Amino acid sequence: MSENLIIFNARIVTPTGTSARKGAEMGQLRIIENGTVEVTKGIITYVGESRGEDRDGYYQHYWHYNARGHCLLPGFVDSHTHFVFGGERSEEFSWRLKGESYMSIMERGGGIASTVKATRQMNFLKLRSAAEGFLKKMSAMGVTTVEGKSGYGLDRETELLQLKIMRSLNNDEHKRIDIVSTFLGAHALPEEYKGRGDEYIDFLIREMLPVIRENELAECCDVFCEQGVFSVEQSRRLLQAAKEQGFLLKLHADEIVSFGGAELAAELGALSADHLLQASDAGIRAMADAGVVATLLPLTAFALKEPYARGREMIDAGCAVALATDLNPGSCFSGSIPLTIALACIYMKLSIEETITALTLNGAAALHRADRIGSIEVGKQGDFVILNSDNYHILPYYVGMNCVIMTIKGGMLYPVN
């Protein structure tokens, strides 16, 4: 199959632009009836109404696909996941059902520490195979770009191993998903540094960041800025050092309590602040003013039985909101794009149009990719999804059920069985 592709007879539905859409802009989509998209060598070269399938034989080396009037959307961007890990934590789910909190499970040695132990015991091939399995499931739900975090090693060897696995998968010539790697060494305090959080931050700054940067293993640096994990000052120190070394910045912020994480993201000019269940009004305003993408993770709130982030208020305050799954082995063992969409509409009060923007262009902006993915426009990558309907309103209507029938990556067609 060729990377040269013509999709015709499509109902094209897309946000537009090369930066995040904020506030009311998020609800503005371009819709083209009976549309055609041309992709040449993986890049979009035409978007518009049909102009005939052959111009002097120009299209003879193109694969033709009749969308039969179905909706054609940009490929989904899952901009916050933890898909490289060992083990599983199903027992913790039953603990939460009995009333234990996320933090209380961490305090008793479960949570992230449990996955760290399992991940440290696995080798490259086993971890890579498991991660590849998750990527295949993501592709079937229309994801064409994903962010993946380290953070289940919390030591030099295993953190680098996670990042090398993501690089290996991203360099696979048969890949269906582009991977943006994030270093999350500050995911939790490892047992060997218990009570010595400042020393662990020193270790990350002096021994991890330079090696990762030199070997181009990650573009972004993230930190779990939360009460009982890493303080605002510790987070600031790590992220400032990362920024000086050329990393883009992301934060796990204000998930458990209002802790000043959103404000810190704005202060440092982070790409995104993620979770934000407890973000303050001041933090929301600061993110809007600074252009920080608010990445919301409704599946995690659902699984933890926590209040949802205030998506509607954030958009109304002028924020750029993205949506992601937060696939991980503990608080959210799900990569369900369909359920993410439904929860965002039902509980975060986003419109269907806003969820599309949040999962495409704004997700791309949260990964510093809005200039090349996230919308169906000339010059961007030929990454799309085709739905099983001409009505994109089915996205939340299909609660937890997949309505994607075709994922297209760089002009390559991948039917969904």
Swiss-Prot record:
- What's the protein called, per UniProt? Imidazolonepropionase
Q: Does the keyword Iron apply?
A: yes
State the HAMAP family in the record. Answer: HutI
- Residues that bind N-formimidoyl-L-glutamate: 152, 328, 330
Q: What is its main location?
A: cytoplasm
Record pathway: Amino-acid degradation; L-histidine degradation into L-glutamate; N-formimidoyl-L-glutamate from L-histidine: step 3/3
Question: Which NCBIfam families does UniProt cross-reference here?
Answer: hutI
Note the superkingdom of the native organism.
Answer: Bacteria
Q: What is the lineage of its organism?
A: Bacteria, Pseudomonadati, Bacteroidota, Bacteroidia, Bacteroidales
Kindly list the positions annotated as binding 4-imidazolone-5-propanoate.
89, 152, 187, 255, 331
Q: Which UniProt keywords apply?
A: Cytoplasm, Histidine metabolism, Hydrolase, Iron, Metal-binding, Zinc
In the UniProt record, does the keyword Hydrolase occur? yes
Tell me a GO biological process for this protein: L-histidine catabolic process
CDD domains, per the entry: Imidazolone-5PH
User: Can you tell me which residues bind Fe(3+)?
Assistant: 80, 82, 252, 326
Name the family: Belongs to the metallo-dependent hydrolases superfamily. HutI family.
**Which GO CC terms are listed, alphabetically?**
cytoplasm
Describe the task this protein carries out.
Catalyzes the hydrolytic cleavage of the carbon-nitrogen bond in imidazolone-5-propanoate to yield N-formimidoyl-L-glutamate. It is the third step in the universal histidine degradation pathway.
